[in-house]
């Protein structure tokens, strides 16, 4: 059952591995955006590891303590939200490489993350396991959908914020990638047993 529920995560790991190898083999200028992309790749890799960890705990609830199961889910949900936030910052960095975000604005942009963290710490989380599919649901999970919508909109807005920085092709790629991930998120919301978030991140790149 564990392997069956990890099929999309395995596909995501393979895609991320190919992207990582391609990135390493091709020379890049030592730009802020290049370093940030490495951070983004690392965050996605960690997210996928946590994703597979939660699949294991929820499919082995008879041998894994409830506190460990909840804690791992909390880390996983937080990692999803942080990848969303970092993706938005990366898009903004590409669109306006010369400017730096002021600390006050960073705090404003992190308000959704802060609210999500409060819910992750104190919120309710439920588990479903029918022997074939397994997933978590509840108010804690809803924070992912809310942050996904917010940072998708902000990412698209950032891509079109300044004329002449990103080409039309680059803007189209940003819009396509972010909308693709959001569509996958909507599919995940309607069919929670599919566990598509990690695959969505990999395809978005």
Where do the model's predicted regions map?
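Short alpha-helical linear motifs
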Residues: 60, 65, 91, 129, ...
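Hydrophobic alpha-helical transmembrane segments of multi-pass membrane proteins
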Residues: 7-89, 106-124, 174-189
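Interfacial "cap-and-anchor" motif at the non-cytosolic start of specific transmembrane alpha-helices
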Residues: 163-205
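Extracellular-loop-to-transmembrane junctions of the mid-late helices
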Residues: 2-13, 116-157, 184, 188-197
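Membrane-interfacial segments
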Residues: 28, 57, 62, 95-99, ...
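Class A GPCR helix-loop hinge within the 7TM core
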Residues: 85-100
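Membrane-helix boundary/juxtamembrane motif in polytopic membrane proteins
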Residues: 98-105, 134-140, 157-179
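Alpha-helical transmembrane segments in multipass membrane proteins, preferentially the mid-helix core
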Residues: 17-23, 86-90, 145-166
């Amino acid at each position: 059952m564990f392997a069956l529920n990890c099929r999309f995560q395995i596909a995501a790991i393979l895609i991320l591995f190919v992207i990582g190898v391609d990135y390493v083999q091709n020379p890049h200028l030592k730009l802020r955006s290049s370093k940030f992309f490495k951070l983004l790749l690392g965050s996605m890799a960690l997210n996928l590891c946590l994703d597979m960890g939660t699949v294991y705990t929820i499919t082995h609830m008879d041998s894994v303590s409830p506190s460990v199961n909840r804690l791992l889910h909390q880390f996983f949900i937080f990692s999803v939200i942080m990848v969303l936030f970092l993706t938005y910052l990366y898009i903004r960095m590409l669109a306006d490489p010369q400017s730096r975000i002021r600390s006050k604005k960073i705090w404003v942009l992190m308000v959704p993350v802060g609210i999500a963290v409060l819910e992750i710490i104190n919120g309710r989380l439920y588990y479903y396991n029918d022997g074939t599919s397994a997933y978590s649901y509840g108010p804690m999970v809803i924070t992912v959908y809310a942050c996904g919508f917010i940072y998708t909109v902000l990412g698209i807005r950032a891509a079109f914020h300044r004329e002449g920085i990103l080409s039309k092709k680059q803007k189209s790629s940003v819009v396509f990638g972010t909308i693709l991930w959001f569509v996958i998120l909507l599919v995940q919301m309607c069919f929670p047993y599919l566990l598509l978030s990690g695959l969505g991140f990999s395809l978005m790149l």
